[in-house]
Every structure is written in C-alpha cells, then in structure tokens.
Amino acid sequence: MEIKRVGSQSSAKGPAEWFTGTVRIDPLITAPDPALVTGASVTFEPGARTAWHTHPLGQTLIVTAGAGWVQREGGPVEEIHPGDVVWFPPDEKHWHGATPTTAMTHIAIQEKKDGKTVDWMEQVTDKQYRRR
C-alpha cells in the first residue's frame, strides 16, 4: 500500500506546447508498472485550454470546480460544471478548458498504452475556442 499525502507531489505548469493560457497540473495517480492508470487534477485559469489531442485508451474528466468547455472534433462546444463527468472514447480528437470568464478544475483519468497516455496535436485557435 502507498499513501500519497496532500502536498507531497509537486504541481507543474502546463507546457505552452500543450496548453494555451495558465494551467496547473497536480499529479494524483502515478501507479507504477504494470498498472496503466494515471490521473491529475488540472486547473485552467479563465481562457486557458488544452491543444487538440487524443488518448489511445480514452479519457474521463470529472469537473470539481468552476465552469469549462469541452469539444470533440466536428461537435459543438459544450459547457461543463462541477459534478459533470465527461468520457472521450479512444482516439477521439478533442480539447477542454475553462470558459473565457471562469476558471475550471477537473480530474483527468486515462490509461497508458505502450507507455503513452496522450497524443498532442495543434493548438485550439481563438476562433475555434469562441465558436460557442
């Protein structure tokens, strides 16, 4: 058994190649091999968002604070709130982040396939982001 105490893992700034705006990533689940699951609490300041990306085994988001937007490629931008759970199937191109005026925090859970949890793509443009 392993217990990770609150504050025992360092926060990381979301890298500019994967995010637009200010994003903080707080690791939650970093199970060692052979476990596949990983997870983090991710906080997006207003206007911040991910780049387009996919997950080889899908991704679950659990919104814990604020208001956010999510979109799958070709679909509408949808608003999400605390308590909402979002599932992106394997290899579904999507993005997620805060609304322009409200920060948003979610827990992101995904599994590793061949050691990889995500495939990052191009940035979400301001036009795509504000298409709501």
Where are these regions (language model features)?
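A short, N-terminal "cap"/entry segment at the start of jelly-roll beta-barrel domains
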Residues: 1-37, 117-132
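Conserved short histidine dyad/triad with adjacent acidic residue
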Residues: 24-27, 38-55, 90
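Conserved strand-loop elements at the edges of beta-sheets that form or border functional pockets
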Residues: 30, 54, 62, 80-82, ...
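Short, conserved beta-strand element in jelly-roll/cupin
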Residues: 41-45, 54-70, 109-111
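Short beta-strand His + acidic residue motifs that chelate non-heme Fe in jelly-roll/DSBH
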Residues: 50-52, 70-71, 88, 93-100
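A short hydrophobic beta-strand segment most commonly corresponding to one strand
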Residues: 60, 87, 101-121
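Short acidic-glycine-tyrosine-enriched beta hairpin
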Residues: 74-91
